Amino acid sequence: MATDSGDPASTEDSEKPDGISFENRVPQVAATLTVEARLKEKNSTFSASGETVERKRFFRKSVEMTEDDKVAESSPKDERIKAAMNIPRVDKLPSNVLRGGQEVKYEQCSKSTSEISKDCFKEKNEKEMEEEAEMKAVATSPSGRFLKFDIELGRGAFKTVYKGLDTETWVEVAWCELQDRKLTKAEQQRFKEEAEMLKGLQHPNIVRFYDSWESILKGKKCIVLVTELMTSGTLKTYLKRFKVMKPKVLRSWCRQILKGLQFLHTRTPPIIHRDLKCDNIFITGPTGSVKIGDLGLATLMRTSFAKSVIGTPEFMAPEMYEEHYDESVDVYAFGMCMLEMATSEYPYSECQNAAQIYRKVTSGIKPASFNKVTDPEVKEIIEGCIRQNKSERLSIRDLLNHAFFAEDTGLRVELAEEDDCSNSSLALRLWVEDPKKLKGKHKDNEAIEFSFNLETDTPEEVAYEMVKSGFFHESDSKAVAKSIRDRVTPIKKTREKKPAGCLEERRDSQCKSMGNVFPQPQNTTLPLAPAQQTGAECEETEVDQHVRQQLLQRKPQQHCSSVTGDNLSEAGAASVIHSDTSSQPSVAYSSNQTMGSQMVSNIPQAEVNVPGQIYSSQQLVGHYQQVSGLQKHSKLTQPQILPLVQGQSTVLPVHVLGPTVVSQPQVSPLTVQKVPQIKPVSQPVGAEQQAALLKPDLVRSLNQDVATTKENVSSPDNPSGNGKQDRIKQRRASCPRPEKGTKFQLTVLQVSTSGDNMVECQLETHNNKMVTFKFDVDGDAPEDIADYMVEDNFVLESEKEKFVEELRAIVGQAQEILHVHFATERATGVDSITVDSNSSQTGSSEQVQINSTSTQTSNESAPQSSPVGRWRFCINQTIRNRETQSPPSLQHSMSAVPGRHPLPSPKNTSNKEISRDTLLTIENNPCHRALFTSKSEHKDVVDGKISECASVETKQPAILYQVEDNRQIMAPVTNSSSYSTTSVRAVPAECEGLTKQASIFIPVYPCHQTASQADALMSHPGESTQTSGNSLTTLAFDQKPQTLSVQQPAMDAEFISQEGETTVNTEASSPKTVIPTQTPGLEPTTLQPTTVLESDGERPPKLEFADNRIKTLDEKLRNLLYQEHSISSIYPESQKDTQSIDSPFSSSAEDTLSCPVTEVIAISHCGIKDSPVQSPNFQQTGSKLLSNVAASQPANISVFKRDLNVITSVPSELCLHEMSSDASLPGDPEAYPAAVSSGGAIHLQTGGGYFGLSFTCPSLKNPISKKSWTRKLKSWAYRLRQSTSFFKRSKVRQVETEEMRSAIAPDPIPLTRESTADTRALNRCKAMSGSFQRGRFQVITIPQQQSAKMTSFGIEHISVFSETNHSSEEAFIKTAKSQLVEIEPATQNPKTSFSYEKLQALQETCKENKGVPKQGDNFLSFSAACETDVSSVTPEKEFEETSATGSSMQSGSELLLKEREILTAGKQPSSDSEFSASLAGSGKSVAKTGPESNQCLPHHEEQAYAQTQSSLFYSPSSPMSSDDESEIEDEDLKVELQRLREKHIQEVVNLQTQQNKELQELYERLRSIKDSKTQSTEIPLPPASPRRPRSFKSKLRSRPQSLTHVDNGIVATGKSCLINELENPLCVESNAASCQQSPASKKGMFTDDLHKLVDDWTKEAVGNSLIKPSLNQLKQSQHKLETENWNKVSENTPSTMGYTSTWISSLSQIRGAVPTSLPQGLSLPSFPGPLSSYGMPHVCQYNAVAGAGYPVQWVGISGTTQQSVVIPAQSGGPFQPGMNMQAFPTSSVQNPATIPPGPK
């Protein structure tokens, strides 16, 4: 009927033309039935002829009127009405206007006007009256714009839809009334905001949303929505009507739906529909267009209805049920819509209820109708959309780019020849299918064959050539280009999926072209290549991208490696390999641990030898498979990768794996080949080239902020792009970087010129999210940042390449800016190290941060990763470490060191940064240059130059042996394998130059750090001379160990800081000596002595090797230089810690203070042996670290000694386990370049800080809270590291990050190494107590534990190296060795198992916010082992680390472990006392710590410890930093700290607020859990606060594992307490909190074996029957509550602090309760027996959570000793372990019995 058709037509039409009313349309279509009918109705009284004429007039008039006026529509009717019935026009108007064509219905009866009479008129009048009644506006909008008619269009569950009219445009609209929602104020506000946002959405495929308001209907409130009126129904009704949808229609409509979704997802912020289904997809009949509707309903329905009611189960993605979802839920729903369209069958129609659907959806079972899809292409697309794992789903962009949805251009492009996947050139054929669609004239049968080079050609260029050749008209060029692109893109994707075959040639060509240019900066260059290749890579399926992202997430370190692997396969072997190499050492570890297990079968040999190597081998294998030309690549890229492999295998070979190393590289034949080629040719040449090419860039990057440089971004920055944290203020440089064809926009907000080299950028993502992140120009690799961005879906995989390019450009610009800035700064500040460092700290928090960054590099102080942005690049830091593994990074770091010591330090931290620093140093110093070159050449030079170095140095033989072994391993060991190699070579060169003065120093350089140190010495001849006595010795010893790349990054950072502090350098050097010893061990797999520290999380063999190394090193070092050197070489982690400390120390006078703190810590640990001797040195450094470089250095050295001693006792096993579990994060960041430096395994360690935080705290997803929390953690961890060498290795990474974040970086660089170390120690303390470092604290959270460990090791090493303390240290080393041996047996196996489990668990728990803590636990174990001798250092470090990583359970557990180990290793309360003293020292002031430590800290330590605890507890906010370092720190440092504190306070506050909220909820949940736990476990301890029990429970499980790990090292030495602490990172925060978190962090990591070991150890060592059951019970309970408790615990624990996640809770607790946790550690150490690790954590588990005010009660630790270690921060009575303890009352009670008087 005319009316029927007319009605829809009118509505449809009204929708189409915007302001044209129904009437308006009618006149235009005067011939239509609708118009005629209407006219008939209106003109029934007129005669036929007259009617016609009248009609025309009226129509025209009405048209005009309608447009202008509401009256227009009624005009025809009005005329008619006037003639027929004198009905007032006003009355008619509404009806006409509203009713439009519906009048036709009423007028139908009058078929001819001639027949119509007055009677008809009357009838008509009556009908019209009825119509009017219907069409009268029954309601109007508050604004009066919209009218509602009483015409119901539809009714749903929650809404009724009426017809309405927009009086402004005369377009009919839909008036939707939603039933009463009973919305809360917050919900109402949210809906208002969403409505305002929806009003602005205008898109052809989105139903227009006009307005909304609240109204009262029938006495009830309702929400009214006015939307566009869709006339042809929904997709659902269409399917019901037509059953089968034609493929063409399906393609067209699906494409329109995708365009609409893309529009929504690209808004800022992104709009997620959440209820997409066929019922909400509307069709506009006339045009066949499709629009997505019901946008505002998802939120409204969500608010007031049960979750099961919200959304449509059939279309709801699995994550929707958990309410943790993103845009991918709409992709899932789209897939289900497409499935329904393809099958006309409702998805999951086989299920009877929503519960069945839920079970199927969450278990990944596809709907039954999925198998009914006939079109394979459609089926593939649907499958890609409805994958259970959201990260594997295709993205909207991928779908739109899919050939199936490509719009028909009338052209067809096909392959003329089969694609062999090997040739980059494709033979394509193009012909015209539909000439009508083209504007030009074409012959239908004419086909154009042409070649297309995937590498160089672009579709636009080819199309343009065709136009020029006359094949097509110019107007068709876009269509031609689109057709070519649509055909080439899938080919690229398939090749990316099969990189072995497809990309071989491409890679070869790239290797030749890019590899030659970038082999030197392989790190950086390759990342560039990957970025470029990302173009192709980005086109790979979303699934592939997501898999890669997941891998990256799992292992931040692996980030790079996994990316590199993918990139390699997708883009070019060279680029992939490069990124791999740069990140491989660290990646190798993390990757090997996380991915290694996956690829174990693939590379068993490599894995056995070195987890890192495994990965690299695998990668290499992949590369080889991918490219036969990989051999060429292997030369360029393999040097890096191989160095990784070599470094890893070499690390083992040094002691046991020498041959293994060789064979390891051979894991894959290509690898072996690469080794020889790369070694001699690629590395030497590439390294030199890198040095030459990278030096300028490196210098620039070191000196330039990551402003907006494009040039330098390419190679120097990429590898080290992760280093810096966002904390540093960045100079705003508006540098919008919309990438070509990318949907993201990158803008530079500011570049920091205060020495941290931080650049703050804002990224507008493809889905219109605004992501603000900061990164270190030198320390963060753009690839790493890109990986993280891709992983978080901020950047599409397809955009990654462009993103990296833009980042590189930014980095280059920033480097230029910084280069200029630092050139002047160096001129004024390098010489005046002290002054510069002060100003740096005070004036430029950024500089401090820079230092931190450099420290971070080696330490993987990716705690930055923890800043919620991740954008900060917590993850990036990990990645950066990976990248730093590559030689270019090393070179960069080296070169940068001389020129820009203040800045390089932080940069050094990141491997890349280190490389740049080194490069700078090389530029400035010939020796450095040589070093750098040798580093680049790594293998050749390592062999030749390392020997030289060894000969030059006193400990030449040992070093030579180690170095030679390390030569192979060294490059790999270093975060960048090339880097490490370069370092080694550089060391020899430097050795020659500085042999007399700093021969040791040069040896330090063999690793990255060694080179840095040498550079620093070179840069500061005077300083180096001062320290030459001790420094040289230390360096010599360090050099070999340093050869272990593990410490090179830290060393580089140190070198940078060393510029002003040779002493620090020496310190670093001595640990470095250990590193070479550990070089084999550096590799996560290799647990050589050198790697012992770094390997301690990696593998038990490492411990054994470490022991052997310790012995051999001891002998060699004694013969060569000092007995202490062997210890330091044994524990590269100590070196790393020292380095970490150095960087911060050199920051300023305060930095100097930091160094004393570190020394104090070391002294405390070594107090038994060297505490008297160190005391003066320590004091000196404390009082004037900068001025007394030489004096300070000895102190530092002695500290190192102690650390080494401690390491010796515990590291073998603890280190091994820690490394094993942490993927080498705990032990040697450099030793485990992949694990430590890279993000994966190290991710646990430093990833804890970066990735750890990121992953650990899913709740930290809030970028702000996460970032601030991470910063706080980082700050505290930093202080911890500074105060305790104990955490030296972790400290290096974290401290570097911390320093950079703390604005210590700038000054530390110029400062002497010692000064840097002091600063670092001070920073550590600050991080512990200073709120300024809170932000950093965040960043450093997990890494802190590592840092703390490294610091303790480093301190011990320093002590060992201290000339005055040689004998004492030697004895201590022996003790440590014995202890280590004791610990080693038990720890080794548990740790090894722990390492992988821990890594995996950590990865998982990181996501849960507790994985990191587990890592921390691992680290803690490691630290504990080291801390046996360095008890004072350990406690302080532990506290600080706990403080710093309060949130990071890692730190907590590590601290506990360390404390325990101190007790066991020290085997005397003095260890405890030392721990206390160290704590007090770090908490109060370096000076205080120094003296106490020097005094052996047995007597003073308790007091000092308590004081330190208090200061630490209070100092998490920053009081601690001021307390610890105020005395020694310069005013500049104070100012800087204050500035940093204030800088991040707001973020912290926000984060705390959010976290508090979450914690509150968790608290309640945990409370109930705790109550149940308390009931189940009866303990003498007072019940812990509710959240404590839960986290305690969840952590209990972790704790047993941690205990197991620690047990291995602590079982014999009664390090149960330490283990407890280690296991309870939260406990570290606040004793109770630390304890609680520890278990959580360890929970994921611990295996049943570990639990058994812990139980057995408890039986043997403690002899406490209760403990054993406790562990089992705890294990079980933790297992039960693991999933929920983990997050809950983490969240509960931080509830007081307001942190969102476990990490956060740990952090917050650490802030207030770090002292508590440390006291726990103290008490634990004091109790020789292994008190139940669980027990003690219970005690502190939540006591300190509330804040620093809670005294640590050791009830949990020792039921008898319910003493409250009075941590000033914990002003309260005893630690109330009740909350925590209740979780495991038995264990904790028993443990307390075991260790009644633990804390003092």
From Swiss-Prot:
The modification Phosphoserine is found at S62, S304, S308, S1070, S1585, S1638. The modification Phosphothreonine is found at T541. The keyword Ubl conjugation applies. GO terms for cellular component: adherens junction; bicellular tight junction; cytoplasm. It catalyses: L-seryl-[protein] + ATP = O-phospho-L-seryl-[protein] + ADP + H(+); L-threonyl-[protein] + ATP = O-phospho-L-threonyl-[protein] + ADP + H(+). Its EC number is 2.7.11.1. It is found in: Cytoplasm. Its cofactor is Mg(2+). One of its GO terms (biological process) is negative regulation of apoptotic process. Changing P204R: In PRS; uncertain significance; results in decreased SLC12A5/KCC2 phosphorylation. Changing S854C: In a lung squamous cell carcinoma sample; somatic mutation. Interacts with WNK1 and WNK4. Serine/threonine-protein kinase component of the WNK3-SPAK/OSR1 kinase cascade, which plays an important role in the regulation of electrolyte homeostasis and regulatory volume increase in response to hyperosmotic stress. WNK3 mediates regulatory volume increase in response to hyperosmotic stress by acting as a molecular crowding sensor, which senses cell shrinkage and mediates formation of a membraneless compartment by undergoing liquid-liquid phase separation. This is Serine/threonine-protein kinase WNK3. It comes from Homo sapiens. The lineage of its organism: Eukaryota, Metazoa, Chordata, Craniata, Vertebrata. The gene is WNK3.
